[in-house]
Amino acid sequence: MADEFEIEAVEEANEHFYGALENADLDEMDAVWLHEDWVKCIHPGWDLIVGWEDVRESWERIFAGGAGMRVAASEVEIKVVGDFAIVSCYEDLAIFMDSVSAPVSARTTATNLFQRVNGEWRMIHHHASQVPDAPEITESDLIQ
């Protein structure tokens, strides 16, 4: 069973990831990820991206879009198994398209996988999908 120190270290690595995302900080994103040709990333609405160079390029494209962003991870759950960690959470996003318009809000669900390498937790997989709006359920929907 993972001890509290390991869970806190994974939580810190996960927070660094979201800090890099919110600040559009490519250098910090470089520090968060493991630089291997097998790491994977799936952004909402994107195809699977494989390999650090392509994953890095995807973050560069997102950050170059110019939209400011606030992101908060909520309902974070962490499981550590040996040198691997699974983090699941919701991402609550506020995207600022310009300095005048109201932000666009979105909620995604994410799975982040980390591997401990030389005592440091590095991201090896990020998958985020938009949470669909729940359809309104009427009484007639419940009658079979």
Identify the function of each model-found stretch.
Residues 2-31, 39-144:
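A beta-strand edge to alpha-helix "cap/lid" segment located at domain peripheries
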